[in-house]
Amino acid sequence: MSFSAAPTESFDVIVVGGGHAGCEAAITAARLGLNTALFSLNLDRIAWQPCNPAVGGPAKSQLVHEVDALGGVIGRLADATAIQKRILNASRGPAVWALRAQTDKRLYSRQMLQLLQHTPNLALREAMVTGLETTVAGDQQRISGIRTYFGSVYGADAVILTAGTFLGGRIWVGHQSMAAGRAGEQAAEGLTETLQELGFQTDRLKTGTPARVDRRSIALDQLEEQPSDAADRFFSFDPAAWVSGEQMSCHITRTTAETHQLIRDNLHLTAIYGGVIDSKGPRYCPSIEDKIVRFADKDSHQIFLEPEGRDTPEIYVQGFSTGLPEPIQLQLLRSLPGLEQAVMLRPAYSVDYDYLPATQLKPSLETKRVRGLFSAGQLNGTTGYEEAAAQGLVAGVNAGRLIGGQEPVHFPREGSYIGTMIDDLVSKDLREPYRVLTSRSEYRLILRGDNADRRLTPLGHELGLIDDRRWQLFEDKLQAMEGEKQRLETVRLKVSDPVAPAVEQETGAAIKGSITLADLLRRPGMHAADLVRHGLADADLPLPVREGAEIDIKYSGYLQRQQQQIDQVKRQSQRKLPADLNYAGIGTLSNEAREKLTAIQPSTLGQASRIPGVSKADITALLMWLELQQRERQPLAPTAEAR
């Protein structure tokens, strides 16, 4: 295709879509000095949260920390608009600790719009983008602009598609449907056909969202309350972004036998179980129908009632998405304890939409077919605001580097959850919505949320996304952390000190003469907060500094071993695999990996790692198994008696 009309305007970068991926991409490109435009179907719904009004959770919070460490904005806005915060997996190790924040969805959107409006080099335009303009240079197509529904043409050196669920979007309530990207908003027309004309493969995916209920119609006093427990925790590493607002409670109810029977009796009325659509939905966020069918042995499922904001009565019924008809939805809601008189403000619905399988992308998120065309977010087959925001930042960075004639930034999977996600997306044939999980990373002890700044802020500063003020804060934190670690390694607690008996009682271990505070921290159950409580640490030392020093000391051996493992996997990619290797007998491999490896019989570890269905965790397990076999075959050195 080529221009048939002169461009109305021209930009360096055009971002198509104003969701979480689009906002990060546009702000990133603009901050890199590029003349950028963000096109949205509805500028009043910028960075909307159409499903769960929350940010973070397992692995997702690590992504948010990483985006912030690079200079992105999702963490800052989540901190500014949080109405409840909790630490998940607090009883487990730091590799899986996760901050989760309920956010005020309308305030979040308003603050993002204000941020976009006040970002230099960034223009906002409301329009439906229906076409892509390209030129041909040699055998390579190159993006040259976009076309809108009403015929305007805009020139650009790079275009980033972040269309979410809007391409060919169709929402379903029972067997009734309408064209829409989400409730109340029209679907985008033409862009799917344009991508197909350019040679791209597209497919369909499905997601859904539960009903919203009027808080005033719920007997909250009859339900279990879930208050905030992490008001002093934040996603951003920048203290200037920390906001401690009024916190609100969530509440918990459960499904009943009546709920389950209603669902079983009416499964045929859903679009999926009725055979009307067959798009794949998210495995890790199933509808209530899927839960009842897949977990038929369970008598009850937990349901969370989450406020959508401080100034709205709307309650999000988390864990209760459904594709059933609206009248049955109300019956289902009223079968839940505490919701017998529930008033449903908005029905649940499913949405199926076109997406672009990400194997058609480079790790930079540039498409392989069209130079200068990038894709990010739910359009790539992911699910979640956090996954979208991370991809948006990567696409924004690499669009800028392409225009500047620089090499793209590659995020290796061992360096971040961002890298893990992108590596999975571009190398695996994923046919269901992709959600980041801690289990997807074989390096999760190193890829923690608390050290995301140490892993990525130097890169953010090098790219120009971390300003001098943030860089100075980062250096000050590192200096304070090193100072605290040195203090802990040198200061000793003597058995004669007044606090020693209390410390011995808490840890269940005697102090023999004296012990360094670092060795004290290494004892199970002893934490930096306990040192503060006993007067053995400075209470004024920032929490991130105290906890960072503690984790480095307490888990130093594990961290060193995992880093060695990372280095070993890199070295071992050319390692030969025995032709007669019995993969079925390696219990640490996933079932899918055993099947694929047995069928293909790869000759090297590197070849095995590139087989779809064989995860990086499987490769690590295979490597460890090979090392164990080698040690068992290696003869022991003769003893003195044998000699």
Curated annotation (Swiss-Prot):
Gene field: mnmG
A single GO cellular-component term on record: cytoplasm
Family: Belongs to the MnmG family.
InterPro entries, alphabetized: FAD/NAD-bd_sf (IPR036188), GIDA_C_N (IPR049312), MnmG (IPR004416), MnmG-rel (IPR002218), MnmG-rel_CS (IPR020595), MnmG_C (IPR026904), MnmG_C_subdom (IPR047001), MnmG_C_subdom_sf (IPR044920)
Stated name of the protein: tRNA uridine 5-carboxymethylaminomethyl modification enzyme MnmG
The protein's assembly and partners: Homodimer. Heterotetramer of two MnmE and two MnmG subunits.
Residues binding FAD: G17, G18, G19, H20, A21, G22
Disulfide bonds: none
A Pfam entry, by short name: GIDA_C_1st
Chain residues that bind NAD(+): 281-295
Entry-linked HAMAP family: MnmG_GidA (MF_00129)
